[in-house]
UniProtKB/Swiss-Prot annotation:
Signal peptide stretch: none
Gene encoding the protein: rpl3602
Gene Ontology CC, one term: preribosome
Organism expressing this protein natively: Schizosaccharomyces pombe (strain 972 / ATCC 24843)
Name listed for the protein in its UniProt record: Large ribosomal subunit protein eL36B
One Gene Ontology term from the biological process aspect of the record: cytoplasmic translation
Record-stated family: Belongs to the eukaryotic ribosomal protein eL36 family.
Subcellular location: Cytoplasm
Length: 99
């Protein structure tokens, strides 16, 4: 908005835009600290599912396409499969750094 113009598309008073709180729909899917903490503890206690162990083994043997196909078969969609592959790859990398 232009400052105090009387005519034209930008006519009107100069205003400061209201600072509205964030909508809950904008936060959807964002992981909270508590949820992340609980999931990490569950992962520590329960370990990996059998299909996850198999996928990790395939990734280690550089059979990425086969791993992606297996994950897609088990999880239903390619998007979920890619996310799982990414997660398991980071787990493998962190375990390599630990040793």
């Amino acid at each position: 908005m232009a400052p105090g113009l009387v005519v034209g598309l930008n006519k009107g008073k100069t205003l400061t835009k209201r600072q509205l709180p964030e909508r809950p729909s904008r936060r959807k899917g964002h992981l909270s600290k508590r949820t992340a903490f609980v999931r990490s503890i569950v992962r520590e206690v329960a370990g990996f599912a059998p299909y996850e162990r198999r996928v990790m083994e395939l990734i280690r043997n550089s059979q990425d396409k086969r791993a992606r196909k297996l994950a897609k078969k088990r999880l239903g969609t390619l998007k979920r499969a890619k996310g799982k592959i990414e997660e398991l790859t980071s787990v493998i990398q962190s375990s390599r750094l630990a040793h």
